[in-house]
Amino acid sequence: MYIPTYEDMLAAHERIKPHIRRTPIRTSDYLNELTGAQLFFKCENFQEPGAFKVRGATNAVFGLDDAQAAKGVATHSSGNHASCLSYAAMLRGIPCNVVMPRTAPQAKKDTVRRYGGVITECEPSTSSREETFAKVQAETGGDFVHPYNDPRVIAGQGTCAKELVEQVDGLDAVVAPIGGGGMISGTCLTLSTLAPETRVIAAEPEQADDAYRSFKAGYIIADDAPKTVADGLLVPLKDLTWHFVKNHVSEIYTASDAEIVDAMKLIWKHLRIVMEPSSAVPLATILKNPEAFAGKRVGVIVTGGNVDLDKLPWN
């Protein structure tokens, strides 16, 4: 198992800079007063495909040699990695095949197709996803770009934390959602070298809390088909992301679906940005654990904004 390095992250940033946005930081006096912390929201929902995953996907696609690239890329994803890989493949002019759960939000499916990705649907379970993908990859021969358990992807995701600490000085902690662990692993990779005094904290839905239970048990515990409003956080940890979680994450906090929806409303209202439920999990956990964040300078990664506006969770 190859563990990506800080140098891999730096190389990834140089590779992807022409194709991504250096996303802005947003703050809210109201949310600072409400939490007792100084919150700095890194708005990855402002990326062209609407999610941070464009970083890792672009690093993987543009790191392929011409012979590999000619065969295209393939992946399985609940949404954002699928759209971001399709976008990166479109930029390079190569094919992209994606396996997605049939229950994935229509907005995410539409985005994949808009960027030229070819979708094969599966049942909303890890086993169905992996079985369906094996068939698709055998038929297409595309390079497998795993949504998170891939050194190229983790190195790319780590560029978000690099920008964050360049934009905001003296962060005591960075909080990011955790599903499979790609973003949190990239954050650990970067901050362990660039800002080792900054704590990395993961935020997870209670109804899909396998990372939390794994963290407490000391080994990977996987749920096959969890259900939560945070549909981007349904996948389990894998060996590579588990390496970063067990060695570098300071804490994992969880929040209920109701708390996640309440936090999502607050962000929509006070930051005035469109973001999806998965992106609200960090604020939900900060609100639920105020003693852990009071008086601290906290970076919060808003991971994506691909939400079906006709199916908002408070409607």
Swiss-Prot record:
Q: Does the keyword Lyase apply?
A: yes
Give the UniProt keywords, A-Z. Lyase, Pyridoxal phosphate
In a knockout, what does one observe? Answer: Abolishes growth on glycolate or glyoxylate, but the deletion mutant strain is still able to grow on acetate, succinate or glucose with comparable growth rates as for the wild type.
Which Gene Ontology biological process is one annotated for this entry?
Answer: D-serine biosynthetic process
Q: Which residues bind pyridoxal 5'-phosphate?
A: 80, 179-183, 303
- What is the E.C. number? 4.2.1.-
Q: Name one GO molecular function term.
A: hydro-lyase activity
Q: Which reaction does it catalyse?
A: (3S)-3-hydroxy-D-aspartate = iminosuccinate + H2O
Q: What class of enzyme is it?
A: lyase
Q: Which residues carry this modification: N6-(pyridoxal phosphate)lysine?
A: 53
State what induces this protein.
Answer: Induced by glycolate.
The record ties this protein, via InterPro entries, to: BHydaspDhtse, TrpB-like_PALP, TrpB-like_PALP_sf
* Cofactor(s), by name: pyridoxal 5'-phosphate
- PANTHER family for the chain: SERINE / THREONINE RACEMASE FAMILY MEMBER (PTHR43050), SERINE RACEMASE (PTHR43050:SF1)
* Its biological purpose: Catalyzes the dehydration of (2R,3S)-beta-hydroxyaspartate ((3S)-3-hydroxy-D-aspartate) into iminosuccinate. Is essential for the growth of P.denitrificans in the presence of glycolate and glyoxylate since it functions in glyoxylate assimilation via the beta-hydroxyaspartate cycle (BHAC).
Q: What else is known?
A: Iminosuccinate is a labile compound that spontaneously decays into free ammonia and oxaloacetate in solution.
Instruction: State the protein's name.
Output: beta-hydroxyaspartate dehydratase
UniProt organism field:
Paracoccus denitrificans (strain Pd 1222)
Q: What is the lineage of its organism?
A: Bacteria, Pseudomonadati, Pseudomonadota, Alphaproteobacteria, Rhodobacterales
Q: Which gene encodes it?
A: bhcB
